[in-house]
């Protein structure tokens, strides 16, 4: 039997403690979401009550059904659009624009990543309102697409820098135009960055609260995150319903990570974030 050194044993203890501390809020949310209102008041947050009740989940889902559908619609479309546009922009910068201009253009586009969203809220609301897209799902799609392009462009550009220029030059010699080079040469090599960028964008857009609360009112286009923040009673907070709602809203991103997690790791290790 292999002996464990005292240093390694101590490291394991620390890691187990940190993992338990990290998972404690999730466990608290699960236990609270399976209690009645009276049980929430009479027990500690980490205490599990048997038998559990699932009435809070039914109540939370009834309240969140429309906002979750709204979030699924605009998150899916904004993720697709921003990822595709970022890929095309990344190909253009990395393979069509050469030299210093390429790096300068990438730096200019990447500036949008560091621009605080709060600083552009007033002009954003005015623009969206003037287009007749306030409180519309299309307005959220356009907003998240526009503000996703800088990060998707950066990720794709750094990946495309790693693809040998000889492949592009060979395609040009064969008479391929830029679009054919992109679709026939670059795109088949882009599975890794598409998975990484798609998961990143979907998670960020799904979890966004700021744009949702500023650009919507009522439930016609309200995202799930905004409705979740309002999921409380008039005078008393229904913690069991709120915790059930939080777990329901977290479910889509969790399922995506479970389904595509192995591709995400492959994307990282294959250089999707290199550069």
From Swiss-Prot:
It is found in: Cell membrane. GO terms for biological process: transmembrane transport. Keywords: Cell membrane, Membrane, Transmembrane, Transmembrane helix, Transport. GO terms for cellular component: plasma membrane. Residues 68-260 form the ABC transmembrane type-1 domain. Its main location: membrane. It is a multi-pass membrane protein. It comes from the Archaea. Gene3D superfamilies: MetI-like (1.10.3720.10). CDD domains: TM_PBP2. The chain crosses the membrane at residues 10-30, 73-93, 105-125, 137-157, 181-203, 241-261. The keyword Membrane applies. The keyword Cytoplasm does not apply. InterPro entries: MetI-like, MetI-like_sf. Belongs to the binding-protein-dependent transport system permease family. MalFG subfamily. Probably part of a binding-protein-dependent transport system PH1214/15/16. Probably responsible for the translocation of the substrate across the membrane. This is Probable ABC transporter permease protein PH1216. It comes from Pyrococcus horikoshii (strain ATCC 700860 / DSM 12428 / JCM 9974 / NBRC 100139 / OT-3).
């Amino acid at each position: 039997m292999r002996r464990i050194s005292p240093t390694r044993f101590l490291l394991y203890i620390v890691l187990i403690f940190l993992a338990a501390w990290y998972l404690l809020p999730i466990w608290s949310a699960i236990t609270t979401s399976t209690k009645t209102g009276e049980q929430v008041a009479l027990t500690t947050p980490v205490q599990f009550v048997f038998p559990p009740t699932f009435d809070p989940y039914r109540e939370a889902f009834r309240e969140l059904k429309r906002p979750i559908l709204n979030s699924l619609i605009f998150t899916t479309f904004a993720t697709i659009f921003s990822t595709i546009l970022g890929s095309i922009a990344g190909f253009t910068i990395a393979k069509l624009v050469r030299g210093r201009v390429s790096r300068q253009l990438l730096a200019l586009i990447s500036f949008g990543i560091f621009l605080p969203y709060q600083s552009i809220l007033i002009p954003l609301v005015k623009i969206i309102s003037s287009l007749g897209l306030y409180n519309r799902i299309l307005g959220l799609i356009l907003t998240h697409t526009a503000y996703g392009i800088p990060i998707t462009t950066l990720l794709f550009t750094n990946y495309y820098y790693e693809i040998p220029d000889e492949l592009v030059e060979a395609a040009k010699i064969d008479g391929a135009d830029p679009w054919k080079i992109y679709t026939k040469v670059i795109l088949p090599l882009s599975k890794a960055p598409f998975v990484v960028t798609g998961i990143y964008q979907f998670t960020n857009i799904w979890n966004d609260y700021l744009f949702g609360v500023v650009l919507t009112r009522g439930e016609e286009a309200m995202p799930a995150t905004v409705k979740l923040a309002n999921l409380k009673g008039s005078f008393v907070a229904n913690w069991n319903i709120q915790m059930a709602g939080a777990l329901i809203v977290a479910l889509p991103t969790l399922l995506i990570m479970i389904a595509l997690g192995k591709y995400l790791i492959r994307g990282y290790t294959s250089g999707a974030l290199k550069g």
